[in-house]
Amino acid sequence: FGSSRRSATKVFGPPLPSARAVQLRTPRAAMNRLQRIAGHVVATGADAPLRMAPTSSAMSAAEKSDDDVVICCAVRTAIAKANRGAFKDTPCEELLAPLFKAVKERTKLDPAAVGDIQIGNVSQPGAGAVTSRMAQFMGDLPFEIPLSTVNRQCSSGLQAVANIASSIRSGVIDVGIAGGVESMSMYNMASSVDPSKFSTKIADSDLAMACLIPMGITSENVAEAYKIPAEKQNSMAVASHNKAIAAQKQGLFDEEIVAVKASVK
């Protein structure tokens, strides 16, 4: 959701037409969920600092209910490199609009049933509300559907998903669309921060000043704090890329990726 050069959307809704997500989980169900989440994390050793258990093993025994909030459709664009990749000259609205169209076509959903749309983003001007709203219309979704955007840095798309799911569970809406979009070619992190516009009083707070630390330095600090050397980071990166290549060859991404025509200048 909302990676540097891609866009992704998810559609949520009740599994049954008449179901509404208004019933809160029982203490037992909540405890089961905590146990599943805890079981998803595997104790790490010196040779595997970030080893995780398969998601399937954590959710296979999940209790099902008619008021469960479920993902009905999940799509995304392909991933490209910032500043020199296939999407470097493609605006965010042109990345997001095809996904709205794909969601509408694949689900055969009546747009009137959609109660809300929320899109996560970080660097777009105007909190990304304008570009996401334009993408909504370019994606053939009517103006009657409200849209909002959210910025929680790298978790922006995930926060949008959580917010829409929460709205369904609380009974505010029955169906919603959530996702994220970002282009670090069009809007890089530095361009969205102008230190001259901040109060001079931020210098009085170490934490306030720390908000200006770039993510690159933050990652170095985290690696040092948790004693994760570059060799282990590189090893994990290689393993991740190998898994991605294997998944591509097996066609595991074919269904979720929506083709987007792009012009490179």
Give the positions of each predicted feature.
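Compositionally biased, low-complexity segments
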Residues: 3, 14, 52-56
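Short, high-confidence coil segments that cap the C-terminus of an alpha-helix
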Residues: 172-174, 253
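Claisen-condensing/thiolase-fold acyl-transfer catalytic domains that form or cleave C-C bonds
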Residues: 123-130, 134-137, 141-143, 150-172
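N-terminal, intrinsically disordered, basic low-complexity segments enriched in Arg/Pro/Ser/Thr
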Residues: 12-17, 24-25
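Intrinsically disordered, low-complexity proline-rich regions
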Residues: 20-21, 29
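Conserved "HGTGT" condensation-loop signature of ketosynthase/thiolase-family condensing enzymes
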Residues: 27, 32-145, 181-265
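Low-complexity, disordered terminal segments
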Residues: 1-5, 9
